[in-house]
Swiss-Prot record:
Residues carrying N6-lipoyllysine: K65
GO biological process, one term: glycine decarboxylation via glycine cleavage system
Protein name as it appears in the record: Glycine cleavage system H protein
Native species: Synechococcus elongatus (strain ATCC 33912 / PCC 7942 / FACHB-805) (Anacystis nidulans R2)
Cofactor: (R)-lipoate
Alphabetical keyword list: Lipoyl
Family according to the record: Belongs to the GcvH family.
Record CDD domains: GCS_H
Length: 129
């Protein structure tokens, strides 16, 4: 199955993505990372009201193959976490971008996306691995 990388997202080396909506960032894990992990069986995410800082680990994703940390691509306060994904983590396998997002974050300042990739750049990066 071909992996999809939506054009409206920014992607990072650690395989998280960000969708910006004004000063709100939606954070998730790319289809490539999900494909590499296999079937997702457990998620651990911080509580609403917590803050995350760019580059810091904020949770874990457990699959049948491995447990991986998830890193914050932006800094801000968590205003929503995906409770549906926490209850049924396999949703990340079927729809990592729409239903399988992880957190919504109120940004602290303007996000630094200089280390991010657009969809075409990210696809070239992961297909070269």
């Amino acid at each position: 199955m071909a992996l999809i990388y939506p054009d409206n997202l920014r992607y990072f080396d650690s395989h998280e993505y960000v969708r910006l909506d004004g000063d709100i960032a939606v954070i998730g894990i790319s289809a490539y990372a999900i494909d590499q992990l296999g079937d997702i069986v457990f998620l651990e995410l911080p509580e609403v009201g917590s803050t995350i800082a760019i580059g810091a680990s904020f949770g874990t994703v457990e699959s049948v193959k491995a447990v991986e940390e998830v890193y914050a691509p932006v800094t801000g306060e968590i205003i929503e976490r995906n409770e549906a994904a926490l209850e049924a983590p396999e949703i990340l396998n079927s729809d990592p971008y729409e239903q399988g997002w992880l957190l919504k974050v109120q940004l602290t300042g303007k996000p630094d996306l200089s280390d991010s990739y657009d969809a075409a750049q990210y696809q070239a990066l992961v297909e070269g691995q």
